[in-house]
């Protein structure tokens, strides 16, 4: 019998996103809300654990996954804009996409499940992952100058964006199966490892051309953090299969926050955490404290 699965996906992402990708979810482009299995239900729809009580104990010994996404990287855009000529209509269409994100963006993530600390049993699951994220943005002004030149807009926004962070995510997932529906939640503790990035609220750079010449100015505020703590929450619901149809919905990181610099205080037991060459950040030979920025 041919089955039809209809999924409704509602996802709210914070700084950190879904984890535990496998080959199946990559092939399905993330449409996993009603068909994820076992440990891989975590991060997509925790309610699915409730309908898997008959399955045996599942234990993940090792694995990792990584990915790169952006607002230009796709087979469609590469095929559409590859060639020896880029017409004005093509430029306008492409530039609208860049404007929505404020530039050309690249987001990279790396997920490493902590060995032997990921398992499911019945309607419960415990997961632990080391997650490393980075986000880089080429300024919109640079793209505008490459596509159109600077004749029509003498002042260009050249603000660069960059952030990198690492954290450990520990999650406890449980689901309550009812007669025809299952609801589930994932409670997550987020252990911040490090953070460094350009503050987008106070940083800026521009390039100006006029009759007198070409000049520019800029100001960047770099923030850093080592050690932090926070919490996250995923919630989901899914129905049992009925005449080949399954419906599901989930909120991933419905609540999610990390407060940085929670483990940097100097006490009588010893010095604060240091990573040579990385943390604490130095500027013109001076070491910055955990609450300072440049």
Task: Go through the PLM ranges and name each one.
Residues 15-132, 136:
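N-terminal, post-signal peptide beta-strand-biased segments of exported outer-membrane/organellar beta-barrel
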Residues 18-23, 124-294:
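Outer-membrane beta-barrel porins/channels
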Residues 4-13:
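Sec-dependent N-terminal signal peptides
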């Amino acid at each position: 019998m041919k089955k039809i699965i209809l999924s409704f996906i509602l996802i709210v992402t914070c700084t950190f996103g879904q984890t535990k990708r496998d080959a199946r979810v990559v092939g399905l482009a993330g449409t996993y809300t009603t068909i994820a299995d076992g440990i891989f239900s975590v991060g997509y729809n925790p309610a699915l654990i409730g309908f898997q009580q008959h399955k045996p104990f599942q234990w993940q010994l090792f694995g990792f996954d990584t990915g790169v996404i952006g607002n230009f990287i796709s087979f469609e855009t590469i095929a559409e804009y590859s060639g020896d000529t880029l017409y004005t209509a093509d430029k306008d269409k492409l530039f609208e996409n860049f404007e929505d994100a404020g530039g050309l963006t690249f987001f990279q993530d790396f997920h490493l499940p902590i060995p032997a600390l990921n398992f499911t049993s019945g309607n419960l699951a415990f997961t632990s992952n080391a997650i490393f994220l980075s986000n880089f943005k080429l300024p919109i002004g640079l793209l505008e100058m490459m596509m159109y030149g600077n004749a029509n807009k003498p002042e260009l926004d050249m603000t660069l964006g960059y952030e990198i962070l690492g954290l450990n995510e520990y999650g406890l997932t449980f689901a309550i199966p009812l007669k025809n529906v299952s609801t589930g939640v994932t409670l997550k503790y987020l252990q911040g490892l490090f953070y460094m990035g350009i503050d987008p609220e106070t940083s800026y750079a521009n390039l100006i051309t006029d009759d007198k010449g070409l000049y520019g100015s800029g100001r960047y505020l770099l923030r850093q953090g080592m050690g932090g703590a926070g919490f996250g929450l995923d919630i989901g619901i899914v129905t049992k299969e009925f005449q080949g149809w399954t419906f599901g919905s989930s909120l991933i990181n419905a609540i999610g926050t990390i407060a940085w610099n929670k483990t940097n205080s100097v006490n009588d037991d010893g010095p604060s955490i240091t990573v040579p060459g990385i943390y604490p950040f130095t500027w013109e030979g001076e070491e910055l404290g955990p609450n300072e920025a440049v």
